[in-house]
Amino acid sequence: MKTPFAYATALSALVLTFASSAFAVTVPPGVTLAASQEITRQVPAETESLDPAHIESWTGNTIALDLFEGLTRIDAAGAVVPGVAQSWTRTAPDTWVFKLRHDARWSNGQPVTAADFIYAWQRVLDPKTGSKYTVLVEFVKNAKAILAGKAPLSSLGARAVDPYTLEVTTEVPAAFFPQLAAMPTMAPVNRDVVTRFGGEWTRPGNFVGNGPYTLADWQPNNRLVGAKSKTYWNASKVVITKVTYLPIENDETAMRMYQAGQFDYTYSIPSGIYAQVSKQFGPELKTGLQIATYYYSLNNEDPLFKDKRVRQALSMVLDRDLLTQRLTADGELPMYGLISKGTQGAAVFKPDWAGWPMAKRVDYARNLLKSAGYSDAKPLTFTLTYNTNDLHKKVALFATSEWRTKLGVTTKLENVEYKVLLKQRHDGKVQASRDGWFVDYNDAMSYFDLIRCNSVQNDQRYCNPQVDKIVDEANQQLDDAERTELLTKAHDTAMNDYPMVPLFQYSAVRLVKPYVGGYTSSNYVDQRATQDMYLIKH
């Protein structure tokens, strides 16, 4: 990504400070607010957890943006603004100093201090916690050594200079660290509450957070309710007093609920009916690309998918243009690589064969399978697992039809709940599976966690030491152009190994009531906190 300053012979410090208006919701002049400021939002699945150490999904992250606050946060426009830290200084390529605000409080009234962040990050890395999402904390110095059991937790590169000053040393220069610090995984956790309640600390009645909302109710698979926190440092600027999240997996059901007034804000719309919904709802339909990728994860340790020829053949015959124009048809872009358009730090990947006529692609792919030992008499057969959702089902049916008609491949479809799929992928219990990645921060490194050797998010179980070597070299560069060139090379190298089957770049297409203020189309990372919204009189 583009760094905000250049290094001379001696590095000069950059201090970032912000006016209060930069991180408060702004109600335009002349707008009359509704008497009731209670909003209901759809999430596409039940959250796997409310514990920052165990949150992995879009749902979990979205809810956690309301219940917790990191050193920084992402505002309505997608910009990095102060959170618990009121300012930060980059004193060296690998060193950041964050000045914490003295009025930051936990929902139980205790002050939020630098020690709370250190405890939370060490907890993510502690094997006893069993976190599956350590990739963000791994940017902090010595984190990887701690995970490998080669260094103690106390060696983590985070130091409390005083209760309200946190010094962070990163493993490599990371200009994007303030973006990364906004993610729920990097949020502080209250040690007293975790110690007292153990695994039950996130239950209503036990829960203590430091975000603009506190947990009022949580009925798994039914609803989760957040109530405006009286102790939040910026509470006077938070307009919405209550947010209710309903986990509805079926987009058609969600749209009916929206029409009935049960939702103010949906996660998505049913696939393939964009024109119809646009005509019916007009400006209530919000659209925009996301820096996010929809793909099929292939277990590279599975006997079938150890062979690159098999993986490449499956990718080559999928008509992504047909998929995105006729089936999903919500503004998605065809993708052949992992990194999506708009990502800073690397270019997108498009193989030469993407421009071939489909007949030529099919012929080449059939020869790949033949050389791998498959034929009409001995067809390639495997199971594709996807989680419950209309879109995922439609895409799976499309892909299996393409593979069957063009390659003679037999694919068994397996549908499971999201939590089940998440565990199966991590445990290596699936052959091929539906997957997707929404960047945590706008930099190519957010994607590389999926393909680096031994990464906990590498469900593909793919490993190419050459890719890791190039990535490590790239992250030592202080010149943006050189870093981008190397990360692009690393991405191209990995994608030419076909560890997965990228399909398309997600679009953010959802219905938002006209009285919901604060929703913008420029938030490409789609991190939308309720505190940035307000309800207009209607």
Tell me what each language-model feature is.
Residues 216-227, 244-302, 325-326, 334:
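Extracellular/periplasmic solute-recognition and catalytic clefts
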